[in-house]
Amino acid sequence: MTLQLRFRLSLAVLCTVLIASALVVLSEAQSKETWNAPAAEAQKKNPVAATESALAAGQKIYSKTCAMCHGKTGDADGPAVIELNIHPAKLSDPKLATESDGALFWKITTGKKPMPAYGKRLSETDRWNLVNYIRTLPKR
C-alpha cells in the first residue's frame, strides 16, 4: 500500500468518525430540548372515553407502533433504542402525568425526530385511544 493511499484511507476513517460523533452529539442535544405543545392544542379535551374497548384498541396500537422505541411499559427501553441509538421519551416518567391529553395527542399527531408524526398514519380516534392507553402505563 502506498503512502498516499494510506493517508487517504486514514483521512476517510477520521472524517467518518468525526461525522458519526457529531451526529450522536446532535441527537442527544435534540432529545434533551423541551417539547411543548401549543397552548390551544394542550387545552384540547379527549373526546374518547377510556372504556375497556378503547384501552384495548390503544394497547394494540401502542404494541404495534410505539413499543419498539418506548418499550412495553413505557420505560424507553424498546429494541430500537440500542439499534438506532435514539433516546425516546420515558412514558413511565411521573412528569408525563402533568402533560394534558391534548398535549400528548398533539405530540403523537405531529411527531418530532426521531419520532414520526402519526397524524396521517392513525385516525383521530386511534390517537385518542393511544393517549388513553399511555395514561395506564405505570409511573415510576
List each model region and its residues.
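N-terminal secretory signal peptides that target proteins for export/translocation
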Residues: 1-7
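Sec/Tat signal peptide C-region and signal peptidase I cleavage site
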Residues: 23-29
